From Swiss-Prot:
Pathway: Amino-sugar metabolism; 1,6-anhydro-N-acetylmuramate degradation; Cell wall biogenesis; peptidoglycan recycling. Gene3D superfamilies: 3.30.420.40. One of its GO terms (biological process) is amino sugar metabolic process. The lineage of its organism: Bacteria, Pseudomonadati, Pseudomonadota, Gammaproteobacteria, Oceanospirillales. One of its GO terms (molecular function) is kinase activity. ATP binds at residues 10-17. It comes from Chromohalobacter salexigens (strain ATCC BAA-138 / DSM 3043 / CIP 106854 / NCIMB 13768 / 1H11). Its EC number is 2.7.1.170. Keywords: ATP-binding, Carbohydrate metabolism, Kinase, Nucleotide-binding, Transferase. This is Anhydro-N-acetylmuramic acid kinase. It comes from the Bacteria. Belongs to the anhydro-N-acetylmuramic acid kinase family. It holds the Pfam family AnmK. HAMAP family: AnhMurNAc_kinase (MF_01270). Catalyzes the specific phosphorylation of 1,6-anhydro-N-acetylmuramic acid (anhMurNAc) with the simultaneous cleavage of the 1,6-anhydro ring, generating MurNAc-6-P. Is required for the utilization of anhMurNAc either imported from the medium or derived from its own cell wall murein, and thus plays a role in cell wall recycling.
C-alpha cells in the first residue's frame, strides 16, 4: 500500500509533527513519526501573526518561508529516522499553521500559513495542501476534518465509540458501529490546552503545565467556572468549530474578578476543559441507544494526568482507552489524519463528512502540487 506523510502544526504553536502512514485498503497503519519544535523566535512570531490584525506582505512571506523550511526539515528527519526512500512517498499532506479560522463570519474564511509549492520544491515530494477551504466553500465549517480519519481507524463493529483530541482546542468525534445508518458526529467542544498553556506561560514561564501538576495544586473557583461556561459557544449545537480567535487570554482575563490566585485559575481552566467535553458528549449522544465502549484520548492533553482524571470524573460510565491499544501513539494521530487526507485527495475520494462540518455534501479536499 502507498506511503504518505502527514504534517501538522496545531494551535499550541509548539512545532511540526510529522507522521509516516501506510494508506489504502483497510485501516491506516502508523509506521513512524517525529517532532521538530519551533525556535522560540519562530513561535513568538507565529503567535504574533495569529493575534495581529494587520501584517505586511513582506512579513507574511518571511514567516511562510521559515515555516515551510521547518516543515521540510521535519520531512527529511522522518525519512532518515524511518529509513524510507524519498521516492517511496506518494504525497505529503500539509495542514499549515492556522492563523485565523472564522467560518461564521461574512464572508466565511479560514487561513492557514503554508506554501505547498515551496514545500514540494524543498522536499522533492508531491504535496497536498489547502485542505480546509473546499469544505468552507461548500457551506461547511472546514473543521474538524479528523473525524473522517477517526472513522477509518477506530470504528467498532458493535459499539458506539468516542475519540477525543486534546490539542490547543478539544475536538470530539462520535463513531457509530459499522453498518449502522447513524452519522459520524464531530465538533470542537472548546479550549483544551490552549488557555492552560498560556496561563502557565504567563505565571510560571513554562510552555505548559507538565502532567497538570499546577492545576492539581489549586482549587476550582466555581463562580469563575460559571462565568467561563456562560460563553454562548458551549451551549451551541454542532456543527461548530472554534480556535484562538475566540478563546484567548483576553477572553479569560475579561472574566476574572482580579482576586483569584493563579493556581486556582489553572485548576478552573482544567475543569472548564473537562466540563465542556462532558457537555459535548451530551450534545452528541441524542439517539445513542447503547453504551459507549471507549473514550480514546489523543493529542498532548492525553499525557495530562490531572485533566484525564477530571474528564473521567465527569464521564464515569465511559472507559478511557489508550490510543496505543489500537496501534497508534496519541501524539501523532492528528498528523496521521493529514497523511490520510492526502491519500483521499490522490485517490479522488472525499475527505470531509458533511454531517460533521455542515457542508452541502462530500467533497474532495485540497490541491495537489507535483514533486
Amino acid at each position: 500500500m502507498p506511503l504518505y506523510i502527514g504534517l501538522m502544526s496545531g494551535t499550541s504553536l509548539d512545532g511540526i509533527d510529522a507522521a509516516l502512514v501506510r494508506c489504502g485498503e483497510g485501516r491506516p497503519e502508523w509506521l513512524g513519526a517525529t517532532g521538530l519544535p519551533f525556535s522560540a523566535a519562530l513561535h513568538d512570531d507565529l503567535l504574533a501573526l495569529c493575534l495581529a490584525r494587520e501584517v505586511s506582505f513582506a512579513e507574511l512571506a518571511r514567516l511562510e518561508t521559515a515555516f515551510c523550511e521547518r516543515q521540510a526539515e521535519a520531512v527529511n528527519r522522518l525519512l532518515l529516522e524511518t529509513g524510507t526512500p524519498r521516492e517511496a512517498i506518494t504525497a505529503i499532506g500539509s495542514h499549515g499553521q492556522t492563523i485565523e479560522h472564522a467560518p461564521n463570519a461574512t464572508p466565511a474564511h479560514t487561513y492557514q500559513l503554508d506554501n505547498p509549492s515551496l514545500l514540494a520544491e524543498l522536499t522533492g515530494c508531491a504535496v497536498v495542501g489547502d485542505l480546509r477551504r473546499r469544505d468552507l466553500a461548500a457551506g461547511g465549517q472546514a473543521a474538524p476534518l479528523a473525524p473522517a480519519f477517526h472513522a477509518a481507524l477506530f470504528t467498532a463493529s458493535e459499539a458506539y465509540r468516542l475519540v477525543l483530541n486534546l490539542g490547543g482546542i478539544a475536538n470530539l468525534t462520535r463513531l457509530p458501529p459499522s453498518g449502522q445508518a447513524a452519522p459520524v458526529v464531530g465538533f470542537d467542544t472548546g479550549p483544551a490546552n490552549m488557555l492552560m498553556d498560556a496561563w502557565s506561560q504567563r505565571h510560571l514561564g513554562h510552555p505548559y503545565d507538565a502532567d497538570g501538576a499546577w492545576a492539581a495544586s489549586g482549587r476550582v473557583d466555581d463562580a469563575l467556572l460559571a462565568r467561563l461556561l456562560d460563553d454562548d459557544y458551549f451551549s451551541r449545537l454542532p456543527p461548530k468549530s472554534t480556535g484562538r480567535e475566540h478563546f484567548h487570554l483576553d477572553w479569560l482575563t475579561s472574566r476574572l474578578s482580579g482576586h483569584e490566585s493563579p493556581c486556582d485559575v489553572q485548576a478552573t481552566l482544567a475543569e472548564l476543559t473537562a466540563a465542556s467535553i462532558a457537555m459535548g458528549v451530551t450534545q452528541c449522544s441524542a439517539g445513542v441507544s447503547t453504551a459507549y465502549d471507549a473514550l480514546i484520548p489523543c493529542g498532548g492533553g492525553a499525557h495530562n494526568a490531572d485533566l484525564l482524571t477530571r474528564i473521567q470524573r465527569h464521564l464515569p460510565e465511559i472507559p478511557l482507552t489508550p490510543c496505543e491499544r489500537f496501534g497508534w501513539s496519541p501524539d501523532w494521530l492528528e498528523a496521521g489524519a493529514f497523511a490520510w487526507l492526502a491519500h483521499q485527495r490522490v485517490a479522488g475520494l472525499p475527505g470531509n463528512l458533511p454531517d460533521v462540518t455542515g457542508a452541502r455534501g462530500p467533497r474532495v479536499l485540497g490541491g495537489l502540487y507535483a514533486g
